Each structure stands twice: as structure tokens, then as C-alpha cells.
């Protein structure tokens, strides 16, 4: 997300990363973006996808909802977020796929995609 504009147009995260940058910097000012706020943004992207699925299992706050949320996360498939693509499974709770990694280099104090 900190290098959103530098990502190639074909990068799966570019659209979401640019949305994060636009929303965040509109609120906090140009140049204020950071990877930590992007993690929070990405969490909301994931929840917007998972919660409607989990609600079919039960009401929020119940054991059924929590189980439904876990099941949704493990089965909802590929989710593009500002810092990569997530695809959790029952056996993989890290979830980040290898397809979206980029190498960054600091040049004159700024991050640059290599």
C-alpha cells in the first residue's frame, strides 16, 4: 500500500491499494499512508466479505457466529487486499499468496519498487 502507484496495472492489489491511499490520505493528509494503517484497512476488506457469510451461521456474539466466521475465512477463497492477496484455508492461517510479493528498495529516503 505504501507503493500503490508504483505497482504495475496488472498487480492484483493495485486497485485496492489505491483505494486505501485515497481514503486514508483524504482523511489524514498527503503522504500520511503507512503499512500499519493498511493492515487495518485490509481487515475491513476481509470482514466485509466474511461477515455476510458468517451471519448465515448465527447472530454476532454467539458460538455459532464465531464458528461461521472461522469457516468463512477458511473457505471464502481469494481476497485482494492493499498489501497482497489472501487465501486462507483450514491448514493455512497465514493466507498470503506468493503471487503479489514485490521487492522494495529505499532510494533517497523513499520506497521504490525494484
Give the predicted meaning of each segment.
Residues 1-114:
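Extracytosolic ligand-binding ectodomains
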Amino acid at each position: 500500500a505504501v507503493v500503490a502507484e508504483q505497482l504495475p496495472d496488472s498487480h492484483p492489489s493495485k486497485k485496492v491499494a489505491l483505494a486505501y491511499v485515497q481514503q486514508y490520505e483524504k482523511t489524514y493528509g498527503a503522504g500520511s499512508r503507512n503499512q500499519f494503517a493498511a493492515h487495518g484497512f485490509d481487515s475491513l476488506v476481509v470482514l466485509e466479505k466474511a461477515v455476510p457469510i458468517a451471519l448465515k451461521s448465527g447472530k454476532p456474539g454467539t458460538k455459532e457466529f464465531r464458528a461461521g466466521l472461522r469457516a468463512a475465512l477458511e473457505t471464502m477463497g481469494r481476497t485482494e487486499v492493499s498489501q497482497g492477496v489472501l487465501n486462507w484455508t483450514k491448514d493455512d492461517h497465514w493466507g498470503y499468496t506468493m503471487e503479489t510479493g514485490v521487492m522494495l528498495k529505499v532510494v533517497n529516503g523513499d520506497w521504490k519498487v525494484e
